[in-house]
């Protein structure tokens, strides 16, 4: 079967790899000159099953209200007259009920455990290198109430098979000595030793190279204009505009891996994805050979901040 994968980020490239592994003829379309050059380019670098509590939970609503009007808020909402944002916001509120949060944690943990296992298998099969470290992820808290809430969330995750354990402030420093300078400010933490970290951009580029060797056709520098409707919701093809000009690309199946752009592409077909974009900021800092920077990946849940050493 011929499959067109739209988007060459970490999700699209990984999808293309496994499709090729199962015998499909795969073409990948992306507007960038290389794979992994947008959302997958610079992120927190965590393989974090422990980050399984959804943003939509009963405790986030008071926090959002406290953060309203603060430009330095860890989670900043910019409301505007956008029906898509309003619809997404209402669905978000509906998922903040305790029962739904528990159900969603169960689903996220199951998916994340499977995803991490597949990543480990892929690493063993291919020897792919992406600066990965297997030193776990440590969530840290300076607020006692936030620590107590996190301990309850960790308990729920343990019920579903994740090794996330509450730890004292002293234990946080034992796990990551770079925290010694802020030990007196720590209320405690949660540590998941099975979690990992790594460079998503390097992983995606390396896997794209492996996929090309398996016959996957990557068409870079090619814009995706629209999906062309056939009968009903059937897709007759995708209109692309690349170095050779416009072309109607046809396939037996299409994988949409365009992140927050996916709803825009699918909306003309009457398919409405409940996806709304979130923006984060990333800084990459070079380290010297004697740097005392953390070696364990850290998550500051209160400030929505992560640190990973590559």
Each language-model region and where it sits:
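Conserved SAM/SAH-binding loop
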Residues: 10, 221-225, 243
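Residues forming the Rossmann-fold NAD(P)(H) cofactor-binding site
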Residues: 13, 205, 263
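Glycine-rich FAD pyrophosphate-binding loop
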Residues: 21-41
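A conserved short coil-to-beta-strand element within the FAD-binding core of flavoproteins
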Residues: 167-176, 196, 217-236
């Amino acid at each position: 079967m011929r499959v067109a994968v739209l988007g060459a980020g970490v999700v699209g490239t990984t999808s293309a790899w496994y499709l090729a592994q199962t015998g499909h003829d795969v073409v990948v379309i992306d507007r960038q000159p290389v794979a992994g050059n947008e959302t997958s380019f610079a992120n927190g670098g965590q393989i974090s099953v422990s980050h399984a509590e959804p943003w939509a939970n009963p405790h986030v609503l008071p926090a959002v209200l406290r953060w309203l009007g603060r430009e330095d808020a860890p989670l900043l909402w910019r409301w505007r007259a956008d029906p898509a944002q309003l619809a997404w916001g209402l669905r978000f509120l509906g998922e903040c009920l305790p029962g739904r949060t528990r159900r969603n944690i169960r689903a996220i943990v199951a998916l994340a455990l499977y995803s991490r296992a597949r990543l480990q298998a892929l690493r063993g099969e291919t020897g792919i290198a992406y600066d990965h470290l297997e030193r776990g992820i440590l969530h840290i808290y300076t607020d006692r109430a936030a620590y107590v809430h996190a301990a309850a969330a960790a308990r729920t995750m343990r019920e579903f098979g994740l090794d996330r354990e509450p730890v004292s402030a002293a234990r946080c420093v034992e796990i990551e000595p770079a925290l010694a300078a802020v030990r007196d400010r720590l209320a405690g933490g949660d540590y998941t030793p099975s979690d990992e970290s790594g460079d998503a951009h390097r992983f995606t580029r390396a896997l794209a190279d492996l996929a090309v060797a398996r016959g996957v056709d990557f068409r870079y520098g090619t814009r995706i204009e629209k999906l062309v409707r056939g009968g009903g919701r059937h897709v007759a093809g995708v209109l692309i505009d690349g170095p050779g000009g416009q072309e109607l690309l046809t396939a037996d199946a299409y994988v949409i891996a365009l992140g927050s752009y996916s709803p825009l592409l699918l909306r003309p077909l009457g398919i409405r994805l409940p996806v709304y974009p979130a923006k984060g900021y990333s800084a990459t800092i070079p380290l010297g050979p004697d740097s005392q920077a953390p070696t364990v990946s850290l998550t500051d849940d209160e400030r929505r901040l992560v640190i990973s050493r590559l």
